[in-house]
Amino acid sequence: SIEEFFEAMYIKHISKVEEYGKRCRILSELYRRLAASVTAEPGKITAFFSQFTPKEPKFFPLLKQLSEVLCEASVVLIESLQHDSPTERSDYYKKIKDLEREGDRLTHLIFDELGTTFITPFDREDIHDLASCMDDVIDGINSCAKRISIYNPRPISENGKELSRLIQEEAIYICKAMDELETFRKKPTLLREYCSKLHEIENQADDVYEFFITKLFEEEKDCIELIKIKEIMHELEKTTDAAEHVGKILKNLIVKYA
């Protein structure tokens, strides 16, 4: 009947009101206890809420430090190519290996911070990828130095030295880009310019590598030496590719946030 229908609707409505009232009372009690805890132990409650506040400052210095390690490794690589003795090459490799380990330490520290920070300045994946790619460039430099030390080839040609100089140029632009990370949302012009430079340098590196490989197969008659030089040059070229990939990640940041 109509009376039964309205009675059922009334009971249903009342039950919802009672449920809402119950929730309000629970929230009210929670707020009361929270206010009491703030008064009694302000340090504890501040520490709790600090987990949910942005921790932007700590990521920027860490990324900057990682880029500085990259720059230093690129300088040592250039220096290493000026020396031909096995002992000197081994010494330079050890220096670069130490820098590679420092790069690994900073990269893992960034990953650890990502795991404990609730709010990050960019998406976690972007920070993770940026740190990983810079670490890849350092790994590439280390791989070049290792092969030079182990293979002990004839003096590196001017093309090889040119590739190492291009790697250093890319490292410098990556360092500059890290300086812009904190403010690029408002002024993305410089960061965009550095990304373009990284792309241009990588194209130059491709040209240098292709020209050298063509000449190598035309002129080198010693098969063992050919294999040594080709592999070292390939590692140098791969390292320029890794540096350009840093630029691609930075371009994505500009698209997403600027």
Segments from the language model and where they lie:
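Cytosolic, long alpha-helical scaffolding segments
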Residues: 1-258
